[in-house]
Amino acid sequence: MEEKDFIVNVGPQGTFKPSGLYHSIPADIDAMFLRYEATSVKKITIYFHGGLVNEKTGMATAIKMEKHFSSIGQTPICFVWETGLIETVASNIGKIADTKLFGKLIKILTKKLSSKLGFDISEGRGAGVTLTNAQVEVELSRKNPFENYTQRNLESKGRGADASTNLPAKPEDLEGEFKFEIESDFELISIVGESKLTIPNAGGGQSRGIIDTALLIKSLAKIAFRVIKRFVGKRDHDFYPTIIEELLRELYIAELGAWVWNNMKVKSNDMWKDNSGISDINQYAGRYLFDKLVDFHKKYPDVQVNLVGHSAGSIAICNLLKMSSSNYPQLIFDKIIFMAPACRIDLFRDEIVLHENRFKTFRMFTMTDSNEKHDLLVPYFYTHSLLYLISGILENEGNDFDAYVLGLERDIKATPPYDSVKEITDSNKFLYEAGKNRTAFSQTDGTASEGLRTQSLSHGSFDDDDATIGSIKFMLS
């Protein structure tokens, strides 16, 4: 089978416009459905890879999944909609981490916050005894720095942030402490004078430029206050990742590339726009295929259509469901399968949980929270998974923290402080409904039934995991 026989490449703004070495045209999709008619196709599976990869990886994934689906009698359609996010973010994180200024700021923040949050006693140092420079250096030399600095460890010793009595009421309360730290470090002052950072401007936006020590003091106080507030509200992502998230949000959001994530989400929606009055490669690729699928379904209403999505592919599927229900509700999808879904829980609730009439079966494969926290996105620097980074800083172009993401077990369990969030409790009831087997957490043990087995230990590896792929093939057979 040639690539054009099963791959739909989505270009800029969700159209057929070329964006790389490979591109699709409307005629390719026309030919697909002519072949389906000629061969009396009865089962179609549409696959969406994660919107986090480049063209080469997206194409390789499509070719791999085509073989899996074809081997069980499914006719595959694989969307390739590359954005390169993972390369952009990982590369930018590495560049930021390598700067002298960043290294200095991390040391200042970890020393100050370890004591403020109660890790002084929980780690056996005694009340008010801060980490030494040598201790900080030792932690930062580890692939997973401050791994044991968690809410659970604090609470087990009665030292949760909410148990402290000397916490600041506002960021300004911390400025004096950071003022002493910064103004006594002449090397840091010199580095600050040579560094450009992204800072809030008078217009309410952000601009990039040199900052002075006074502004840096205010920024560090804001970062520390937000970390403390997240710990008190139990909305943290553990000690070190939370500090990294808030430091990036305050001073490095533009350099991080949060805009890439937003652009990917926009593309996942744009591809389903109406093509009325548009022609040729200016048409929206997803909608063009959908309209052809509708015509095919009208002729052959017994055709089975499945949707499978990995990571951000779940967002594309949710957007497809919204559009499909408005334009052709007669198309009921047979099975919807998510792997490590990166969609927000409110989107999932609105398009899947509240509309079970749109499909027959749903299942999600994702990691346990423990495994999610040991999937090191960037060792030594951001030490939780990509889904944690999305939740912590990428949603809403950096303006949201601890956004609710479907693939994170900690969010869908609906335990405090998430037990009063409506979209979470609604989704929890759906996902854990007795007898439905809608969730499988990696790694499953030897007692897991066929169709519920998964062994992946990294966000990006679900589509390479034999157990997960075997479960999906079992479901679709």
Whereabouts are the PLM-identified features?
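A short loop-to-beta-strand scaffold at the N-terminal edge of the catalytic core in hydrolase folds
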Residues: 21-36
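Conserved strand-to-helix beginnings and helix N-cap segments that scaffold or border functional pockets
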Residues: 56-62, 318, 348-350
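Gly/Ala-rich beta-loop-alpha elbow adjacent to hydrolase catalytic centers
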Residues: 307-313, 317
